[in-house]
Amino acid sequence: THTVWAFDGYTANPADYPAFRAVADFNTTHAAPGNTTGWFMPSAGQLWDVLEHLGGVKALADQRTNGDQEWYGTDPGNDICASLNRWLAHVTDAAKFGDSYNWFWSSSEYSGNVARLWRVRSDGYVYCYWNSKGISRDVRPVLAF
């Protein structure tokens, strides 16, 4: 998957992808440590790794070679939102994952108006599919060391 690392190099109109603009704005209001990449919107593959390893979604391990356009799976008994929140102990409650479900964008683009979107639920369901960039969903900026 492709990750757009720097807003400065993005040639499309940022208004066409509000999630990308949100990450650029986040960089201006939340200083990243100097020894990091700075905040960026992760690719679908990077989010896959976060969900599998930090969210404990074992069902993703079985789908690593799945080439489907859209994918969903279930990990019964895994409250994915709570699993992810355990890694967010030092952030405000408002910035944590909600109690029942969450949607969030990736930087993986299919076309000028479509990008990869993830949805996770507290009942163990996880979805990954393409959707219109104009839809209002959350974005989870990350940084790398």
Give the residues covered by each predicted segment.
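Short aromatic-cysteine micro-motif
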Residues: T1-F40, A44-A59
